[in-house]
Amino acid sequence: MAYLKSIEINQFRGIQELSISGFSDINLIVGDNNSGKTTFLEAIQLLFAKPQLSSIKSITNQRTAIHSNNSFYTSFIKMFNVEQDKEDLDLEISAKCNDGMRRVELIGVEKAVAGEDAIQLSKMSNRQKEQYKGSSGFIPETAKLFEGKIVTQCGKKTTEKKISCTSLDNGIPGPIVKKEVFYISSFGHLRYDLLQNIVDNPEYKNLAISILKQFDDSIADICYTKADDGTYLESIITKNGVNMPFSVYGDGIKKILYILNKLFDATDSILMIDEIETGLHKKYYSTLFPVVFALAKKLNVQLFIATHSMEAIEAILEYGNYENKVKDHDSIKVITLKKVNPEIDHGSNIVARNVTGKYVYDNRKVFDFEVRL
């Protein structure tokens, strides 16, 4: 089982010298806007990614998934220090896990090259290069080239691999590999398969339907149905036998199914959920969250949940049942990220406060503790 105990982000995107330890089963990542919550979740993914550009692309694309035409190279370069103005680039993340140390480091140089040279050095196939020359209308006078290496450590095994890409690259070839950890973006429920792991598992399917009925009691079944053009649609069957495509339902039902689907994927691993409140009305938090946490425990899934919603935080803390039990282990940790001045804070530009769910619950109750700042 993949389980994160601590992490050090020496350099990644806008985060410098951030160290957090003492993670638990359910970890809430909170903080002000632009405090690094999504970057933190990306850092965890990068630690477990395969040392290849195609795996890195799958992480960088998460921010721009709705806008598929965004440049891979631009997203890739922004993984390094966003304020770094020198040619030499580097990022480094390390962590202690239940299976030993993990570490990833990207080191390289960005430089300008002639447009013709960039085409030849790009990841495009020979056919794509010819198509680019013929269809683009013009070849840029200069382009950017990154050359470097990825160094990864998993336990006692260290791997080093040379990489390169140009600002003309968009499609990055590489084998499709099973991910070790899993991520739910704030808008993932709008575009990904929602039933993949549910419809073929009767027990899991019945659980999903029972949850959906609390949103809409007319729901009787969920399945794939074949349309007239031969495609398969994700559909809901009502108790009156009416076949309704998911497209006519709101985001809440899609978000629930997406979370349940990804939980199954993340069995014996880590699941990160960005902005868990997106698409969900707050009145359903108390119904959904206990089911998600109970399933995560059953499936051995460690959760990292980013949110800026105080209502979501309070609903998650209710799961701790702090009024009725006393025990040493608290399954909930609340990690608050906050921007600071690196010149004052020994080079760190973001610091973390890590406290137990019970601490936040007690202080919210007595002092109206603001955990997000």
Describe each PLM feature range.
Residues 1-58, 243-373:
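Switch/communication elements of ASCE P-loop NTPase nucleotide-binding domains
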Residues 50-266, 270, 333, 338-373:
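Phosphate-coordinating catalytic segments in nucleotide- and nucleic-acid-processing enzymes
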